[in-house]
Amino acid sequence: MEIRKALLIFSVLLITMMTFVFCGQTSVQNKNQMVRLAKLVIDSTQLENYNALLKEEIEASVRVEPGVLTLYAVAEKNNPTHITILEIYADTVAYKSHILTPHFIKYKNGTKDMVKSLELVETVPLVPGMKIK
């Protein structure tokens, strides 16, 4: 009976400790995340080509870079040349690594004459750790 009691207490303590450890790691990871918006205006005569290069870059980044958590691009419904990209990186190291990848460099070089304006907006998540389903 005493052994059962001791095992039960040990199990509860172990589960409690694991919860604190894993929740703490998640909290630290979320605090280190780099989240920003890239707001672009694209030359209307090159929009189709731009969208193709953007799609290729986003798909490659999310597929091969573990530090790229989200790249979600949207165009304004009534103004499709105005594009906003939600960028979420594990941390600034992941971002710095991302901009040195061959697929990002190909995107930047391929679109430099298509982009009329680019604004990078640094943000602070209001609900840190929120996952996109």
Question: What residue ranges belong to the model's regions?
Answer:
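Short hydrophobic/aromatic beta-strand micro-patches
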Residues: 41, 74, 86-88
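Solvent-exposed loop/turn segments at secondary-structure junctions
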Residues: 45, 77-78, 90-94, 126-128
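Glycine-rich beta-strand-turn "strand-cap" elements at beta-sheet edges
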Residues: 5-8, 14-35, 72-79, 108-133
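Short, glycine- and small/hydrophobic-rich beta-strand elements in well-ordered beta-sheets
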Residues: 24, 59-84
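An amphipathic, aromatic/His-enriched active-site/gating alpha helix that lines ligand/cofactor pockets
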Residues: 57-70, 88-122
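Generic structural signal for individual residues within well-ordered alpha-helical segments
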Residues: 7, 48-51, 96, 105
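N-terminal targeting signals for Sec/Tat export/insertion, comprising classic cleavable signal peptides
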Residues: 35-60
